[in-house]
Amino acid sequence: GPVLNPEDAQILERMLRTARSVTVRERSSLAWCRERGIDARLSVDDATDYPVASPARTLHYAEGVSAGQALDELPEHYVCVTVNECTDQQAQQIARLLDGMWREHGYAPVFLSHYGDPQDPASGDIQAHQRIAKRLRTSTPATLLPILHADQSIAVHRAAAFTLTSRYHPAVFSAAAGIPVLALVPDAFTQMRVGGALRQYGLGEFTLPLGMLAGGVPELMVAAALRHAAVASDARRTELLEVLRAERAYLLTQILASGAEKLDEVEAPAPFPTVEQVPALPEPLGATVRAARELFTETSLTAGFEWAMSDRAHSWDAEHRRQLECARAIGGYSAHGAEQTRPVTVEAYSEAPAEAHPAQPGLLARVARRLRG
């Protein structure tokens, strides 16, 4: 998701209907399931209470790359930054925001990659981080970290004073630890996931499309997030951890139960507790940003759907060409050097019966037929 063409939606629905238990991470997914009569429950991401090993596990890096020294020298107060993509203009705007956080709050930017290759230090999020870092003022100290093992990554997030991210799990780790978060959203997919995760904590308003970095809005949202974190208790976080543990216990009971009668005896967890959302901006600015966010999400979904349909068409076209080439290769040449002509049938994604042909249908065509029952 969130882009599902009709065929994909049918496949997903069949998958969920065959599951013994369905749990989702955000209310948009819950609504999708309930619209189709699927008995789903809402919970939090299973990395919310990720247990860090002791000693923390590490990755195997390419020669000359070491994360240990940088981790030992992290600043006392810092904003943890994870950005996976941005334009040059957005990189400049993010750098300006980070300069302001250093100047006003004393938070030094620490760039933490969540995607990359430990054997290729120039790959992944580090590329966007380098572009942002080189636009910082010379007076703003910055630390660039490579991709880390989850044990180390979570430790960095939990020790931060603030999190600025366009990725999902940095928001999950930080919100679970009570660290204020501002999510910079590049598309509808991220908005649904990150916004859904933050909404569980009452922080769903702290998401901002990357195209809205100008005009002082992100600075206001950072200030609001810090004010809320200064007075917030850990009651909601404790409540969500209890929800997650109850969900796991319920799933385990279902797995161990055998037979319909025993399954009926398993008591489902209590409904997911609701929470009031914390305002991120004063009104009417907050309403304006919400409307812009909704329009951005709708536009991104439309573009994503069109891309998905185009990608699907190209995929089937490539598969048809492959089958045609295989069929021609099977035809081959006769022993006398003359090409043997054989009827060729290309399997299509259609209910129409194929012409009589001794060859077996292509793999994708067989899968499609199986899914259609």
Q: What are these model-derived regions, one by one?
A:
Residues 1-347, 364-367, 371:
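Active-site anion-handling motifs in enzyme catalytic cores
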